[in-house]
Amino acid sequence: MSFQPSSYIVTLDEVRSKIEACVSDINEWMTDNKLKLNNDKTELLILHAHHRPSPSLDSVYADTELIKASESVKNIGVWFDKTLLMKKHVNSVCKTAFYQLRHLATIRRFLSYQHFEILIHAFVTSRLDYCNSLLSGLPQNLLQKLQYVQNAAARLLSFTQKTEHITPILKELHWLPVAVRIEFKILVLVFKAYHGIAPHYISDMITKYEPTRSLRSSSKRLLVVPRHNLKTYGRRAFSVSGPMLWNSLLNNIRETETLSTFKKQIKTFLFKRSF
């Protein structure tokens, strides 16, 4: 549920009552359908911009159980914090990935390059790529933490020292940097949405650019970039970042009809831009 700042629209008591009413409706629906709401797993997360003070709403009631607000919650393997800066998620990914790298390092000399690369992608790269479209627009210092993980994996795979520059290594491995991999994921989602092969809740977030009169840009398959505020929040939204990245592609890439060909073309495009 979303609310405007309490001073403009509603008081915190009204916000609390609306949330509790929503939970009550959910509980009633579940009861009618022979289900039960697990209050022990019910969590409350109050989201707010990092430049605004935290709302004083600290708890609500779910039936008779008092649910206190959490600093962060985990959903489908991703940690969300109250300012959506994803700090806990980034730190969790880095901790787990470095743990896996330390263990993989003990068996590196026993495996061939091809077999060890498979392990790197299975235990490390998969963690960096999981839900990484949510990391779009994060501060550079957070993305750099994830880049350190990829750099360490590249050095371990290629038997190179920390003193050697990482860019030639990533280029030789043909690995896109972490920030660019995020762009790759978003562009794939935009392609699916544009061609109607994405879920409706994703497709509904993009709008094709259709000028009212005939223009040269009419045939370029551009998307509308919504008006937005704040680089740290508005521009991070898929409805904004997706069209911006899509419109920056070359015309021949946007005109691609198949997903497999599109993936190859944007990887080549992003790789050349990165290196």
Which functions belong to the PLM regions below?
Residues M1-F275:
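Hydrophobic/basic alpha-helical segments
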